[in-house]
């Protein structure tokens, strides 16, 4: 078992490029790497999967239970050297003032050691203060997010006698802070206690190891690196495992949803090979492999919040047995052909969502709304994911036969789930990135337009306002919103309510028409197994109504049909 997390003090520090360079190098050296992205991001995963050709997925402590994340990581580490790319700054979580959902929390839950990528551009000795702050804050949190479930076994007699959790948390936080401020002529290294080496020293007693196990400098000159590396290692007793200088050949731009897509960067594969060459020159393998070997061994069994992945069961991705609720016994899987739109315009999918559908009997059929004239024959359902349809408005509008094919399928009652960009495609019209208004599929009334800002952004929990085709009143499903386009439909057309986990803000969202459910939120299907079961069941029923068998009683594993279009 081997794995590391690539984390950083903030976005823009070089996490994605360091991750991609390391994955390229690991693959080159025969380590069979796999990649995970912490949090709800899709685009970084596209770099991992499309450009590098490595398995990838997401680790998300808001969407998933700790048990499910551990199982997923453990399965991957049985066959791969795992590299998990962090999200935003290492401690940044929900609401901007919590570690919930942060890289730190995910690493604490999984016992996954972190390599902190520190951007050295325009700084030198000041980086020492930054590193010390991260190490000490990491240790002060003691592997417990400040809003985790209260466990009285961790508390003293006074607390066990009845101290309220909030009061207990504040007191323990204050004690930890005071302990770290009390130096008494000793220097804390934030990792192994005091540099004096005395294990009985007040700085060493009771201190737990950091998740941060190594430092990697980005955009640093060789001269500064050779001077600062021994200073960091001597003062903080933490290995500095390498650096990258400023790389003028590597240029990865960004747009409103993050990094540009891999296919939009000329020569990206060649650039990453050059990046791997430079990492090979400046990366210290022995300490990296030693750190990676600790993965899983430091699992602290952090209590997982009840709301983290609530409703999701464990054992398989969707928390369901194949064939559940479909009128057949497990093992006799009723297959259905599920069309997945995947091309340059529609490419945002959680791999866990696709696996959940496969476990429910789906045989995935990838197709392109841009390049194919019509839907593949014999589909029983559709999922239209997010992406950048606004950048391809002219081509989507010109493909009239595909728009008509999707509209006809919806009119016959085909089960369809559409998210964000997929939702925009189902509208009457869409304002493209060039300002031109283009006709779309016309399945749902409304016009998609550039809003100019992210009016709704971040994690959400959604609940239906009435019984819906795939959801029942009282059920909840988790999701994420991030979009600069909006729709001019009225609020009375929405069928669900989205609520932020912090701050209490909520808003109406999602629309239905026949068996179509669509909206801006990207849903995490495994957080609501009922949605997966009902959608799968209705896909099977749709195929039966249209007298299609697709060898539904096959006992063999599901296979992928169709081609996945290169991005």
Model-inferred region functions:
Residues 5, 83-85, 115, 216, ...:
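Structural motif
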Residues 112, 238, 411-415:
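A short helix->loop->beta-strand "cap" motif at the edges of active sites that frequently abuts
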Residues 336-400, 404-409:
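Phosphate-binding active sites in nucleotide-utilizing proteins
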């Amino acid at each position: 078992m081997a794995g590391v997390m690539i984390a950083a003090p903030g976005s823009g520090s070089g996490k994605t490029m360091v991750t991609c360079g390391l994955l390229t190098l690991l693959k080159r050296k025969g380590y069979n790497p796999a990649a995970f992205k912490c949090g709800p991001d899709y685009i970084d995963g596209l770099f991992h999967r499309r450009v590098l050709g490595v398995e990838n997925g997401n680790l998300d402590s808001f969407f998933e239970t700790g048990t499910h994340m551990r199982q997923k990581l453990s399965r991957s580490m049985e066959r791969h050297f795992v590299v998990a790319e962090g999200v935003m700054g290492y401690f940044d979580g929900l609401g901007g003032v919590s570690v919930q959902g942060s890289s730190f929390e995910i690493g604490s839950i999984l016992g996954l050691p972190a390599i902190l990528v520190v951007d050295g551009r325009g700084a030198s000795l000041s980086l020492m203060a930054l590193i010390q702050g991260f190490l000490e804050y990491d240790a002060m949190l003691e592997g417990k997010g400040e809003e985790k479930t209260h466990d009285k076994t961790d508390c003293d007699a006074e607390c066990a006698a009845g101290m309220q959790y909030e009061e207990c948390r504040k007191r323990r936080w204050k004690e930890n802070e005071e302990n770290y401020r009390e130096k008494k002529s000793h220097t804390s290294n934030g990792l192994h206690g005091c540099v004096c080496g005395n294990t009985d020293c007040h700085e060493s007693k009771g201190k737990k190891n950091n998740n941060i196990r190594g430092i990697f400098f980005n955009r640093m000159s060789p001269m500064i690196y050779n001077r600062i590396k021994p200073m960091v290692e001597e003062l903080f007793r933490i290995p500095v495992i390498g650096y990258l200088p400023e790389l003028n050949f590597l240029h990865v731009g960004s747009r409103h949803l993050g990094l540009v897509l891999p296919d939009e960067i000329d020569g990206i594969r060649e650039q990453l090979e050059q990046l791997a060459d430079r990492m090979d020159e400046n990366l210290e393998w022995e300490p990296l492999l030693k750190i990676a070997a600790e993965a899983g061994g430091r699992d602290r069994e952090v209590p997982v919040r009840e709301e983290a992945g609530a409703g999701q069961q464990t054992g398989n991705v969707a928390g369901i047995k194949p064939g559940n609720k479909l009128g057949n016994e497990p093992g006799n899987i009723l297959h259905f052909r599920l069309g997945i739109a995947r091309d340059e315009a529609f490419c945002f999918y959680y791999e866990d969502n696709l696996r959940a559908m496969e476990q429910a009997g789906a045989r995935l059929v990838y197709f392109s709304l841009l390049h194919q004239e019509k839907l593949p024959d014999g589909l029983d359902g559709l999922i239209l994911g997010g992406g950048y349809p606004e950048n391809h408005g002219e081509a989507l509008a010109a493909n009239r036969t595909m728009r008509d094919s999707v509209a006809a399928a919806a009119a016959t009652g085909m089960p369809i789930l559409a998210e964000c960009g997929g939702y925009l495609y189902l509208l009457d019209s869409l304002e493209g990135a060039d300002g031109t208004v283009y006709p779309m599929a016309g399945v749902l009334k409304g016009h998609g337009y550039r809003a100019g800002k992210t009016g709704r952004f971040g994690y959400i929990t959604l609940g239906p306002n009435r019984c819906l085709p795939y959801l029942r009143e009282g059920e909840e499903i988790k999701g994420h919103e991030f979009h600069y386009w909006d729709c001019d439909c009225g609020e009375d057309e929405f069928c669900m309510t989205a609520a932020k986990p912090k701050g209490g803000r909520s808003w109406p969202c999602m629309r239905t028409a026949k068996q179509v459910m669509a909206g801006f939120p990207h849903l995490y299907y495994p957080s609501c197994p009922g949605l997966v079961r009902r959608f799968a069941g209705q896909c099977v029923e749709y195929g039966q109504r249209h007298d299609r068998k697709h060898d539904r009683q096959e006992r063999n594993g599901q296979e992928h049909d169709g081609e996945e279009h290169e991005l």
